[in-house]
Amino acid sequence: MSHPALTQLRALRYFDAIPALEPHLLDWLLLEDSMTKRFEQQGKRVSVTLIREAFVDQSEVEEASGLLPSESRYWLREILLCADGEPWLAGRTVVPESTLCGPEQVLQHLGKTPLGRYLFTSSTLTRDFIEIGRDATLWGRRSRLRLSGKPLLLTELFLPASPLY
């Protein structure tokens, strides 16, 4: 099963540098903290609609090429992050199988728990970069994060109902 928003997310084109945008947009696109937390600060009840969670081969995560170690399998999680039941963000997390050892195994068992609830409570979380992307109409971003030094790639597409717009 897929979702049209995930097709748009995969179509994002990334800027080589941070573009000159309105401060309001940059505030959302360059947020270092949890997007889940930001949505909750808007007074919303945040929930996850799980689209897909599975091991996939490298051909299904081509956007990770050069950004993550080359491995035969990756854990892929695709979700919609909803605020009061309305989708505000599409998310796609790609985790190399080698990252899923030790406490990071929990990434395979998040289910309907927002990723941010786990990531941003970890004292071992670091972020290598944020890249801003855009398709024809929507903004997005991707980040390489590390848990205990082990990488994962998070891509987020802000949907039309999101307060980013």
Curated annotation (Swiss-Prot):
Subunit structure, as described in the record: Monomer.
UniProt source species: Salmonella gallinarum (strain 287/91 / NCTC 13346)
Family: Belongs to the UbiC family.
Function of the protein: Removes the pyruvyl group from chorismate, with concomitant aromatization of the ring, to provide 4-hydroxybenzoate (4HB) for the ubiquinone pathway.
Protein name (database record): Chorismate pyruvate-lyase
Annotated InterPro entries: Chorismate--pyruvate_lyase (IPR007440), Chorismate_lyase_/UTRA_dom_sf (IPR028978)
GO molecular function: chorismate lyase activity
Positions contributing to substrate binding: 35, 77, 115, 156
NCBIfam families, sorted: PRK11655.1
Keyword annotations of the record: Cytoplasm, Lyase, Pyruvate, Ubiquinone biosynthesis
